[in-house]
Amino acid sequence: MRKDRQNKITEVGIYLKDLQNRLCRAFEKEEGESRFQETLWEKPNGGGGRTRLLTEGHVIEQGGVNFSCVYGNQLPPAATQKHPEISGFDFQAEGLSLVIHPRNPYVPTVHANFRFFIAGKDEADPRWWFGGGYDLTPYYGFEEDCRHWHRVAKKACDRFGEAIYPRFKAACDDYFYLKHRNEPRGIGGLFFDDLNEWEFKRCFEFIKILGDSFLEAYLPIMQNRKNHPYGERQREFQLYRRGRYVEFNLLYDRGTRFGLEFGGRTESILMSLPPRVVWRPNWEPEPGSEEARLYEDYLVRRNWVSVSGA
């Protein structure tokens, strides 16, 4: 039983580290000269990881692609909130987290996460599950970008049944929502947790197909918008909207809570936060402006893959 558990951890880890390498290479190609700087970290008797951070790039103002593999004798509260019956189990967890904060306000911020947990007591049959997804946070909306993003996500999901995309799309809309602002963080994507409804091999295959689809979903958007002209107004709005990103990650994000409760490397956990941000109390967009359109047409629940988008 223990060998089977370790085999699962090893298999998932090999894929996630390879995905980390591919993602970093792809973004470095977009940058030209800037490179991710790698930091290896260890937690005594608790695992470790490799953090890769790119800062002050031409295209990417700050971006992180992190891999971690941690273990312990008790799951942090953030991981057992929905399953208190496993709160006393020892565990192993692996994950890849990506957040890219582009410099150009017309390029959306993007987030992706793929994770695997396995927990058990003694040699009992371990419980395992996958979680993750990806979501997009534009500052200025383009219909074609949103449709492309969601159509790639749907294509990846449809290999596992037509009900998967609507289910995980709805879960993403629900999760990435700022209740105190009464608004979504962005235009969504896919989100899932506790995925173990299929056998391990099929669940893992889903993770791999989703992970492999990420660059197809995001890179064309970055490539099409990274040279879009912008001025001080657009930059200020980007910094203002980044405040919502900070609020969500510090108030609601379960991955952030898990990492901090576990006692992981703080710098790696908080790499999701943008390098520059502003808050403007009581600010409202000018009616009819591009900024107003973001709220009216994009920060709403929509069926992005339909012809009408209604």
From Swiss-Prot:
Q: Does the keyword Iron-sulfur apply?
A: no
Give the enzyme's main class according to its UniProt record, as a single word: oxidoreductase
Has UniProt tagged this entry with the keyword ATP-binding? Answer: no
| SUPFAM superfamilies, per database record | Coproporphyrinogen III oxidase
The terms describing its cellular component in GO are: cytoplasm
Provide this UniProt record's keywords sorted from A to Z. Answer: Cytoplasm, Heme biosynthesis, Metal-binding, Oxidoreductase, Porphyrin biosynthesis
Q: Annotated pathway, please? A: Porphyrin-containing compound metabolism; protoporphyrin-IX biosynthesis; protoporphyrinogen-IX from coproporphyrinogen-III (O2 route): step 1/1
Q: What are the binding positions for substrate in this chain?
A: S97, N113, F114, R115, G263, G264, R265
Q: Which residues form the active site?
A: H111
Q: Which Gene3D superfamilies match?
A: Coproporphyrinogen III oxidase, aerobic (3.40.1500.10)
**PROSITE patterns per the record?**
COPROGEN_OXIDASE (PS01021)
Q: Which InterPro entries match?
A: Coprogen_oxidase_aer (IPR001260), Coprogen_oxidase_aer_sf (IPR036406), Coprogen_oxidase_CS (IPR018375)
What segment(s) does the record annotate as region Important for dimerization?
A: 245-280
Site (Important for dimerization) residue list: H180
Give the UniProt subcellular location, in the record's own words.
Cytoplasm
- Name its GO BP terms in alphabetical order: protoporphyrinogen IX biosynthetic process
* Record GO terms (molecular function): coproporphyrinogen oxidase activity; metal ion binding; protein homodimerization activity
Reactions catalysed, as given in the entry: coproporphyrinogen III + O2 + 2 H(+) = protoporphyrinogen IX + 2 CO2 + 2 H2O
Q: Which annotated residues bind a divalent metal cation?
A: H101, H111, H150, H180
Family indicated by similarity: Belongs to the aerobic coproporphyrinogen-III oxidase family.
Role played: Involved in the heme biosynthesis. Catalyzes the aerobic oxidative decarboxylation of propionate groups of rings A and B of coproporphyrinogen-III to yield the vinyl groups in protoporphyrinogen-IX.
> What quaternary structure, including any partners, is listed in this protein's UniProt entry?
Homodimer.
Task: Specify the protein name.
Answer: Oxygen-dependent coproporphyrinogen-III oxidase
